[in-house]
Amino acid sequence: MQAIRPARRHHLEIAVLIGALLCTRVTPAAEPQRERPSPRVQQLLTSMSREEKMAVIRGGREPAEAAQSEAGWTAGVPRLHIPDLRFADGPQGVLVRHVSTGMESTLSLASTFSVTDAEANGALIGRDARALGIDVILQPYINIYRDPGFERAYNTLGEDPVLTGTLAAHIVRGAQSSGVMAQAKHYVAYDGGENALVDGQALREIYAAPFRDVSDAGVASIMCSYNQINGVYSCGNGATLDGILRGEIGFKGFVTSDWGAAHGAEFITQGMDMEQPGTGPGAYFALGKEPDEPPATKEAEDDLQAAMTTGAPEEQRYPLPKYAGPPIPPVPGVSRNLGEALARGTVTDADIDRAAGRVLTQRERFGWLDHAPSHKVVAQDIAGNARIVQRLSERGTVLLKNEGILPFSRADLDSLALIGPGAQQTFAIVTGQEQSFGRADREIGAWQALRAMTHSDGLRLAVADDMTGVPVPPAAFAQLTRALTLRGASAITGAASDINQTIRSHAMLPAGASAKWNGTLLVPADGDYEINMQLLGATGRFWIDGRSIGNMGWWGGHGDIVFANRDNVIPTTDGLDNVRRLVKLTAGPHTLRVEANADSSGAPVQVRLAWVTPPMKERAFAEAVETARSAKAAVVFAWSRNRPWFGLPGEQDRLIEAVAAVNPNTVVVLNTGEAVAMPWLGEVRAVLEMWYTGDEGGWTAANLLIGKANPAGRLPITWPRRLEDGVATDPAHAERASSNTEGKAHYSEGIHVGYRWFDHEKIEPLFPFGFGLSYTTFSYSRLSVHSALDGGLDVTFRVRNMGKRGGDEVVQAYVGAPDPAPEGVQFASRALAAFDRVTIPAGTTRAVTLHVPPQRLRYWSLADSTWHDARAGRSVYVGGSSRDLPLSARFAH
């Protein structure tokens, strides 16, 4: 599912209805070989009415008294003991109305280069899902990191299909071993643009390859994507669904549409088995026209636009995308629902049976035809989950630079400045999209963690950018009134002195309360003010001079409960949700309106209007620099949500440069979703990329900074020197970008994505794919390559830990192009073929064998549309990154 479409449940249903009126007939693809359902499933299909079959292949609305605000639901058939199913969003974690584990980001997990860690991640997600009464998790996300401008690039497992597919397969195994179905997404080429124009070799070798791995791992379901592939919508693309996914790859599970990605009833003939959300007038997998629903109000549309395009104050100076909603398919003629398609003969009952049979087969496989999966919400293993998240976050951290300053010694801690909001609070979630909102009560910063671990009095904190602010004081309000409505009572209106009703102010409102404030805000001077609406236990909105400034919890797609991490980069320091907006105000009076309406959590209602004035911002920045000046060493915590592309928002670059100018022992800790420019790299002594850490990031940072953990994460993406160096951001190839005005992304680079592009074009990256430092060093020797029994290769070598500290090395094997290479076929000069993460004690040597499966030695020929073996005449390269490969051997046979 797609982050920029959070209102899909209502808005997509309206949009898809429009699309249904514009459709053409879909031409069925050739029927691939299919496995027959089991006798039990066949008997069920015989016993089911057409309407009952529809119930298992079409989303619906779970009764309100039972719903967990999950992403989707199918009703089942109680008469035949076929249970209903719940689907929950991700990655990462499990997104429902209940609090659940906040996990490290997917790029952080990818940076572990560890199948053990991937399986642990999947198992944790699976256990949380079962505890929350969820049956199907909408993850792993296995598209390829191709274009940093694509809105979901941060959700990937990196730029390489082998890394992505290998880790994803183990996520699936971990999750499904916990008793939930995994649904890998988004098939296919959902990597940039509404229409991916990609050739058959790149499509199979790069973009479909991870789906082969999860299929081999037994994934229960795959989600087809919003985009078109070569002009045909993914969920109705018989060539990619029935042709590649089922025919070539051999996938045996069921295919579900992304929410609103079906554009015709005939998609059921092309390989799509289940429609989601499946409700409303735009539902295609319905036997007739569904009842109309009230159209979205202008206020709701404005809220959607604001939520999708308004960033935090640090981000608002940069151009943000205009949310245009889902693409409307210009394809007139396709049936508006299955009832119409059956009458026209474009769909048959056999098509419905086939789709229902695939879904029922997976239910049978998971034992859900013998008994219903439990939908009871039970206690999660909070402490156990926290230990796993902390370990994975530590193992996914990448040390990009270290000039001998890390790890800090005990003496360093006697005078250490910790600077930035990330020093006080961990950047656990940051994005607030299709993932668990985490446990804000566990999310302490590195400053608190280091104090607890070391008991040092020399740790100094300066946030530099105060994201909480201070309550707007009573003196800044005039004629302020509050209308308070308690549950079941009439509103009581009276004068108010401020808007500060929280636990901290000892004035919180009772559960179920709603309140409206109206009055005048008195602004002391012209300037850019950060105005923050802070809530818990309620949804809210606020206006200045009649203009909507911010809202929180307005979208009920995953329930109305407001979590502390729901609408912000980080919560307030006292654990409230925090909608921060930068507002240019003139000195004098401004009309103000604030509303808070109790959510369904049953929690007391807390409401606060806070601000950060221009003088406050200047003072905080100056205090941070002075704190750094007086310390022996300084650590600056910086963050980004890819707004702007390839940069740190706000004044963070200036802050790092100012701190480094007064303290030569400056370390930077990054919490970013993707690569960022580092104009200050030469001025600092160390850089740690921690990505988004999950709930335990403060402890992670502390352990890494003082050496209780040894960083060994490796980059799953190439870190460019310039944004323009990337394959989809090259100004000479504007047609490749997901943001181009045509809506078409031309994958004209073929297979040369990520590090393959940098190698092909001989571009020097800032940090190469697979790169990462450690607090020790390693050497490689004695490479040998032999044929394996399965037709692949076994690559054996030795790795020695040259230092005085034990550590992990990520060993990587790449294969070169055949020599001679077949004419008309693309090959990477080096392509990752195998990897492992190995632990080596100080001063010892370890023998390592990596296996290269035969599929990674094959290529797809566009000339004859066939896979070919290409083992002979290829070199194998081994080392610690795509640009550090000290060992090589040629395999001749």
Model feature map: region roles:
Residues Q2-A15:
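Bacterial N-terminal signal peptides that target proteins for export
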Residues E13-T24:
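Bacterial N-terminal signal peptides
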Residues R25-A29:
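Sec/Tat signal peptide C-region and signal peptidase I cleavage site
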Residues A30-W860, T866-R883:
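Glycoside hydrolase catalytic-domain context in secreted enzymes
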Residues D884-H893:
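Short beta-strand elements
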